[in-house]
């Protein structure tokens, strides 16, 4: 029996898991897929931590983001190894927030009932820190697995040129920054279905990588350093004695530079034992 697909939706900065796009997504895939629409924390490191925890537990088959949620999805997709649809991605959240310093309210209900929040310099600096490294794990393998969807009437985010510096598939829809329910079902959902069809995730979720020096490895698990709680990667050599190795997750997935050339330290590959 085929396992039910799981979709993880990441909402925009002012939104929640009950925003219009989230509700439309749940309605569109009712009976067809398991849809997760969590409330994301205000602070970006907390949001990313929660998303990773959900990915560890629920093992989604695709990430779907809108605005700030797309900012998160782009960074997480190559690390967890699943395709992503980035709706109106906002890759410069610090600029967006700097013009809005002060007290605000979320535009859709939050499950904890807390609707008020404040934008301040510390929050802006957190986003700036992430923005400086947001494409560090972007790789050749993922170039056609992360799709962008851009509203032709979007007045807030204009990042299609930046998106196309890293990815190949750009789509458009006749709408603004936040799609209506009808627009979401008409334009987002067919692309989500196509991503699920074109890039199915292996049931065992085994992934293979090639080091830039040529050796190949199997990714075994994501783990935590018991002292620092830093994310680590456990991987096994597919040569020699098939030894197991551990290194910080960032050092495994990041892009490095050698002799003026930039490339992934470990490049994901299609490979069968």
Identify the residue ranges that each predicted region occupies.
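The alpha/beta-hydrolase serine catalytic core
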Residues: 83-198
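Mixed-charge, low-complexity intrinsically disordered regions
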Residues: 197-273
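Active-site catalytic motif of lipid deacylating hydrolases and related acyltransferases
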Residues: 2-57, 177, 201-202
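Residue in the alpha/beta-hydrolase core beta-strand immediately N-terminal to the catalytic nucleophile
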Residues: 61-64, 83-85
């Amino acid at each position: 029996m085929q396992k039910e697909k799981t979709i993880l939706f990441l909402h925009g900065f002012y939104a929640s898991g009950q925003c219009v796009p989230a509700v439309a997504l749940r309605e569109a895939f009712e009976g067809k897929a398991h849809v997760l629409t969590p409330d994301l924390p205000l602070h970006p490191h907390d949001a990313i931590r929660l998303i990773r925890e959900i990915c560890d537990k629920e093992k989604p088959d695709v990430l779907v983001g809108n605005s700030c949620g797309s900012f998160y999805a782009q960074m997480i997709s190559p690390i967890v190894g699943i395709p992503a649809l980035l709706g109106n991605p906002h890759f410069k959240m610090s600029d967006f927030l700097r013009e809005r310093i002060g007290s605000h309210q979320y535009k859709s209900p939050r499950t904890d009932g807390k609707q008020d929040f404040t934008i301040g310099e510390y929050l802006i600096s957190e986003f700036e820190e992430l923005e400086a490294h947001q494409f560090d794990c972007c790789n050749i393998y993922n170039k056609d697995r992360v799709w962008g969807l851009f509203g032709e009437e979007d007045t807030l985010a204009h990042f299609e040129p930046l998106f196309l510096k890293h990815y190949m598939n750009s789509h458009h829809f006749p709408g603004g920054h936040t799609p209506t329910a009808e627009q979401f079902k008409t334009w987002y959902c067919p692309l989500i279905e196509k991503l699920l069809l074109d890039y199915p995730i292996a049931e065992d979720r085994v992934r293979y990588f090639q080091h830039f020096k040529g050796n190949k490895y199997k990714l075994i698990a994501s783990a935590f350093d018991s002292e620092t709680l830093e994310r680590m990667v456990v991987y096994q050599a597919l040569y020699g004695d098939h030894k197991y190795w551990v290194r910080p997750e960032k050092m495994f997935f990041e892009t490095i530079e050698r002799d003026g050339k930039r490339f992934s330290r470990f490049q994901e590959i299609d490979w069968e034992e």
